[in-house]
Amino acid sequence: MTNYYFIGIKGTGMASLALILHDQGNKVLGSDIDKETFTQFPLVKAGIQITDFDPDLIKSNYVVVKGNAFSDDHPQVLAAKKVGAKLLTYPQAVEEVIRRHFSIAVSGAHGKTSTTSLLAHILSNFESTSYLIGDGVGKGVFSSKYFVVEADEYDRHFQPFTPDVAIITNIDWDHPDYYKSLDDVKSAFSEFADHVKKIIFAYGEDPEIKKIKPKTARILSYGFEKSDYFCANNIDKRTEGSYFSLSKGGRKLGDFFATIEGDHGILDTTAAIAVADYLGFSVDQIQKGLLTYQGAKRRFNISQVADLTIVDDYAHHPTEIKATIDAARQKFPNKRLVAVFQPHTYTRVNAFKDEYVNALKSADKVYITPIFGSLREKAGNAKSEDILDKLPNAGAIISESNAYDKLSAEHGSVLVFMGAGDIEKYEDALKKGFE
């Protein structure tokens, strides 16, 4: 048994890893801010202690895992160095865990969490599987055959990973506070691909992915084109989900149904099916997994309050926003769609304000909250009005105090809440207004 201490244990990846190491019989505790987050509830349920940032809590026999948002001069990091504790970054800690198993890393600018979650679910139904998902979910089985991990490109966090198999869902410019251009992003994915040992399943219609030439792994494409090795075709999108056929190497693999919406949902599902097929799972096994899948946290989660339908989604990049609104159109074809968007980081708003406008235009009406910063970026020269003022379908800037008054008036509509920050507080304010 090893003693692990996580600095920033409520982070989505950190919470997942903490749960995995706890499941594997280790002692786990960690520190974070007092603010309530959705990731803390599984930690509390597992009996994992969450402390403040007191440096005296760090012991020499701990393996200290430093969250990505914490600098080397953080008091607890300095304390770990002072007492001689083993100190790992989050990516280094993940690599130490996954190297003990046959590992599948899911990467990409968009769709990582949904694809990781679905693949982990399919495999877990029929084989002992550990997984680490970016929605704060993690499960660790010490002797598991497979380990499915979400591989985050931010700050090149996925560079230490050496997976047996990988998925690359797409390459797009995001995280403008770190990546300065699309070429910069592509170079990071190229480095990641060079570390994959066996095979990469990659979206075949992505022009940047086509430029990647891995040192060792071979690439099999998936997508909607006949030239893709795994080709989704005969697609029938309905309100209950999507029906489609899948061909493999020009021959029919099988017919599938999944409770997913939009082209992006079909692509993510195709990627998961391709990996499961490669690992030897049958079409029947895969379809059973698809039928019992209930989705990932904050990925198109649907609820109801009064006469309003609520969709909660993590979308925060223009590409993701457009995909989420398109998915809502498929699910609710006869409903009015009202987007409630929380911009995430000032650098994103500065870099993508026009793209946000174009994506949000596809909703019937748009409300925007103030910008959510981050631990790395708490202020900037952008503002939410930079987006709202350019929208022909603009509503208003909403706050916790006016969320109920503004949104409850959208009778019979679908409210699509999108954001990667704390947008749940606006949903909660709306729901409390009905109590």
Swiss-Prot record:
Gene3D superfamilies: Mur ligase, C-terminal domain, Mur-like, catalytic domain, NAD(P)-binding Rossmann-like Domain. The keyword Cell division applies. The keyword Transmembrane helix does not apply. It is found in: Cytoplasm. Keywords: ATP-binding, Cell cycle, Cell division, Cell shape, Cell wall biogenesis/degradation, Cytoplasm, Ligase, Nucleotide-binding, Peptidoglycan synthesis. One of its GO terms (biological process) is cell division. Pathway: Cell wall biogenesis; peptidoglycan biosynthesis. GO terms for molecular function: ATP binding; UDP-N-acetylmuramate-L-alanine ligase activity. Its EC number is 6.3.2.8. It catalyses: UDP-N-acetyl-alpha-D-muramate + L-alanine + ATP = UDP-N-acetyl-alpha-D-muramoyl-L-alanine + ADP + phosphate + H(+). ATP binds at G108, A109, H110, G111, K112, T113, S114. GO terms for cellular component: cytoplasm. Cell wall formation. Belongs to the MurCDEF family. This is UDP-N-acetylmuramate--L-alanine ligase. It comes from Oenococcus oeni (strain ATCC BAA-331 / PSU-1).
